[in-house]
């Protein structure tokens, strides 16, 4: 019965693909307290996945804004942060962090079978650790940032965990302050771009030689807009075409690199977005961001501005290339 249901769903999705039905401009999340943080998209099922700081749940929003709980942790005190879909292998990768039951953070990297909704892999990063964001390369290898330590981890198909890259530049300025945050692999598949939240910085790490680390320099708008409270530090990031989009609480910056060394970028900025942003992803050839209110609630001690939403980000906000 379950197999037949999956076949029916697949057939329906094939029809939708042929009709080229566009995704909604905005998705509204029902929760009023979850603080959704990470965002990922599955192109096979036309589904968004939103992780949550509160409640230990991962939410799935399918076409036509149908919302359901994809996964509920047996421990509601854990937080889920970064998320990434490996569509080829039908896996949703998520960072799980526990900062509520122990003053020393500990975290795991989890993988879920998207079609079965089952937890299939779990890799413990140890203590202390703060898994913030993650991505995969063409071979399915996972790369994850640690906001508490100056490390980028690599996880292979055998779930073997190793420190892929480490540098004093990546270290938090003091305990409890976020260090490394969002990351993504460049379109050429040879470089990893990763942001540090405090102080704001962007680094290029060679995938072939992780000791080859360069801090990216900028022209155009100032990176992270020093002194502007809408830009408390970079969070999620995503390549869309040859441009890298970096998300802040109250703005987004578009970075266009001068060449494939990915060591210099021209920056353009928009603040024509709601405050509360944390993550960004590509869905059906469009950019979407999640309005989660994490900075407002966690760092400013204020109530969230509801509702939580996933909404389209139009690249035209940055002007012509």
Q: Where are the predicted features?
A:
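Short, conserved, GDST-rich strand-edge loop motifs in beta-rich repeat architectures
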Residues: 95-105, 292-306
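Asp-box/WD-like beta-propeller blade repeats and closely related beta-sheet repeat scaffolds
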Residues: 105-139, 145
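Short loop/turn segments immediately following the C-termini of beta-strands
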Residues: 53, 97-99, 147-149, 197-198, ...
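A short beta-strand motif characteristic of beta-propeller blades
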Residues: 23-29, 67-73, 118-124, 162-174, ...
């Amino acid at each position: 019965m379950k197999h037949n249901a999956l076949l029916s769903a697949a057939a329906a999705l094939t029809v939708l693909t042929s009709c080229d039905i566009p995704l909604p401009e905005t998705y509204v999340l029902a929760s009023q307290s979850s603080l959704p943080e990470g965002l990922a998209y599955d192109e096979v099922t036309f589904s968004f996945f939103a992780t949550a700081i509160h409640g230990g749940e991962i939410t799935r929003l399918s076409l036509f804004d149908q919302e359901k709980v994809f996964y509920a942790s047996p421990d509601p005190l854990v937080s889920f942060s970064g998320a990434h879909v490996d569509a080829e292998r039908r896996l949703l990768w998520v960072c799980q962090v526990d900062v509520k039951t122990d003053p020393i953070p500990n975290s795991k990297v989890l993988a879920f079978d998207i079609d079965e909704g089952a937890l299939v892999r779990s890799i413990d990063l140890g203590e202390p650790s703060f898994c913030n964001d993650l991505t995969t390369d063409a071979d399915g290898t996972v790369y994850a940032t640690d906001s508490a330590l100056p490390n980028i981890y690599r996880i292979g198909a055998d779930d073997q965990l190793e420190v892929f890259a480490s540098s004093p530049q990546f270290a938090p300025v003091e305990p409890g302050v976020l260090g490394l945050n969002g990351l993504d692999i460049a379109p050429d598949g040879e470089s990893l771009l990763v942001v540090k939240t405090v102080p704001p910085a962007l680094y290029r790490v060679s995938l072939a030689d992780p000791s080859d680390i360069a801090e990216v320099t900028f022209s155009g708008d100032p990176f992270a807009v020093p002194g502007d409270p809408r830009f408390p530090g970079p969070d999620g990031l995503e390549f869309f075409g040859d441009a890298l989009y970096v998300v802040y609480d109250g703005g987004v910056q578009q970075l266009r690199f001068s060449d494939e060394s990915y060591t210099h970028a021209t920056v353009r900025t928009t603040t024509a977005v709601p405050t509360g942003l944390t993550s960004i992803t590509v869905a059906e050839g469009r950019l979407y961001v999640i309005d989660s209110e994490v900075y407002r609630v966690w760092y400013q001690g204020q109530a969230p501005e509801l509702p939580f939403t996933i909404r389209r980000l139009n690249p035209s906000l940055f002007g012509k290339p």
